[in-house]
Amino acid sequence: MADLPQLIQKAWQQRALLHAAAGQNTYRIFHGFSEGLPGLNIDRYATTALISHPAALHDDLTIITATLLNCHSFDLIVSRPQKQPAKVLRGTAPTIPLEVLDNHIKFQIEPLAANPGLYLDARPVRTWLKQHSENRRILNL
């Protein structure tokens, strides 16, 4: 897809405030549905990029990886095709969970697992919970 690098670069630039935010190194870089390419999502977890994509975009992974590396020096880039196991495109698979920050809260994720362990779409709920749970313990089921 010829305009794929431009779409990803534009999305990266639009998130400049997130890149610079203290206590925040985890967020969605590219949301395909709203950015012109349904099915493709790219999430940032600190120095890791997770590319969730349909099988039809498999041939574009080299372009996506190169574009992401032009935006940021990711240590690890992982492809997560729908209904298939994750695959490392760049870097080395971690042997322990990775620590990331979301709204100054530390989380541990496993980028090669079917579920990395942190839903980025739930940030508003976590923010509300943080505001309303000071000095309390929270059980996450």
Model-derived segments and their meaning:
Residues 1-46, 95-97:
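Non-catalytic accessory regions of SAM-dependent methyltransferases
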Residues 2-24, 53-55, 61-80:
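Cysteine-centered catalytic environments shared across enzyme families
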Residues 31-33, 53, 109-111:
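Pocket-edge structural micro-motifs
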Residues 36, 40-43, 59-121, 127:
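Non-catalytic substrate-recognition/targeting regions of SAM-dependent transferases
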Residues 127-128, 141:
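Metal-dependent phosphodiester-processing active-site neighborhood
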Residues 130-132:
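Solvent-exposed alpha-helices and their adjacent loops that cap or buttress functional pockets
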Residues 134-141:
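Conserved class I S-adenosyl-L-methionine
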